[in-house]
């Protein structure tokens, strides 16, 4: 449908002061589109990419564009040319989320209460355990790109600096931070990472590519940042590689629903849906774009629970 005149005016005002995107020469790529001709833009290579810069210079805005680049866009303001690996997942902390039978031992081990982290369960996850679960669940669904913003991450999941490692020894800390696994995730599992960071320089060491957003313009500062990082100690890495996470979760989820006299799926806006009395909170699933997606997810989950989760198929087989 054609936007109203008022909406169109607001849209034009928003674009009036926009800064035209300019790609650094080192990341410039060109390709020809059918009926469109040649276009040129920034291509971020596979590997570990760090996006840095001062506050309000466009770091998170660039990441948000990449998050939604998994979708096709209506032609208009240029977002239709933002293309991201379709398996890309936005990873963040989700305090309070539930976790069921998930192997987070790649990041969380030796909890003081003795709780099993190979098959971890909780109704109220912390920031670090929730982000660990989000990473492992993305691996389980064969994601090949993680998108992470420092602002929405659990600090203790992302990094432990050298001083903290000296004071709190490795065998006293149950969390293996993401920085110690990021290189392994790429080299062993083929999973790239794009991370927005504004305050922690430790990721300069493992990064393959470092882009600085300067007044909304991306600049390649990889060489400069790598040279500067030589004067600072690297984070120590675990001595042993961790076994592959276990992805054999099987659920028989339909029995209790089949006993219900009436089954109702209700969409509660873009951020939640309910099946009978159970509510699924999607506030922190940032790649959901509209309410219709949430409705589709609700019906897909209902069908899956009634017809596919038979206790024999693992979640990957169910999803396929």
Model regions: which residues?
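N-terminal pre-Walker A segment at the start of P-loop NTPase domains
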Residues: 12-38, 113
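Conserved alpha-helical scaffold flanking the Walker A/P-loop in AAA+ ATPase domains
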Residues: 131-138
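Glycine-rich phosphate-binding P-loop
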Residues: 40-67
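Single conserved hydrophobic/aromatic residue that forms the stacking wall/gate
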Residues: 1-7, 11
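AAA+/P-loop NTPase substrate/partner-engagement loops
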Residues: 69-108
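Flexible beta-alpha connector loops of hexameric P-loop NTPases
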Residues: 111-128, 160-175
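Conserved NTP phosphate-binding and transfer environment spanning the P-loop NTPase/kinase superfamily
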Residues: 187-190, 196-320
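Conserved P-loop NTPase nucleotide-binding/switch module
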Residues: 138-182, 186, 196-226
């Amino acid at each position: 449908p054609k936007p109203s005149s008022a909406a169109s005016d607001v849209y034009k005002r928003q674009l009036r002061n926009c800064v035209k995107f300019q790609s650094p020469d080192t990341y410039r790529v060109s390709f020809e589109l059918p009926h469109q001709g040649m276009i040129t833009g920034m291509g971020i290579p596979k590997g570990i990419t760090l996006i840095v810069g001062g506050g309000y210079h466009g770091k998170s805005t660039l990441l948000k564009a990449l998050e939604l680049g998994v979708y096709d866009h209506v032609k208009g303001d240029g977002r239709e040319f933002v293309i991201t690996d379709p398996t890309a997942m936005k990873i963040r902390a989700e305090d309070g989320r539930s976790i069921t039978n998930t192997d987070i031992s790649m990041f969380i081990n030796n909890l003081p209460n003795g709780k099993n982290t190979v098959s971890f369960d909780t109704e109220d996850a912390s920031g670090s355990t929730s982000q660990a679960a989000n990473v492992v669940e993305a691996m389980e669904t064969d994601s090949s790109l993680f998108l992470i913003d420092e602002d929405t991450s659990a600090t203790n999941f992302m990094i432990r600096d050298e001083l903290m490692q000296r004071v709190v020894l490795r065998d006293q800390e149950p969390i293996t931070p993401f920085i110690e696994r990021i290189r392994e995730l790429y080299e062993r599992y083929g999973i790239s990472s794009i991370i927005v960071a504004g305050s922690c320089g430790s990721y300069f060491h493992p990064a393959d590519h470092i882009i600085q957003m300067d007044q909304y313009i991306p600049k390649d500062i990889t060489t400069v940042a790598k040279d500067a990082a030589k004067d600072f100690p690297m984070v120590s890495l675990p001595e042993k590689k961790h076994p592959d996470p276990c992805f054999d979760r099987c659920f028989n989820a339909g029995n209790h629903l089949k006993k219900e006299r009436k089954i109702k799926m209700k969409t509660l806006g873009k951020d939640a849906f309910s099946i009978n009395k159970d509510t699924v909170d999607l506030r922190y699933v940032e790649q959901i774009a509209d309410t219709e997606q949430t409705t589709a997810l609700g019906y897909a989950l209902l069908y899956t629970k009634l017809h596919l989760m038979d206790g024999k198929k693992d979640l990957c087989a169910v999803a396929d």
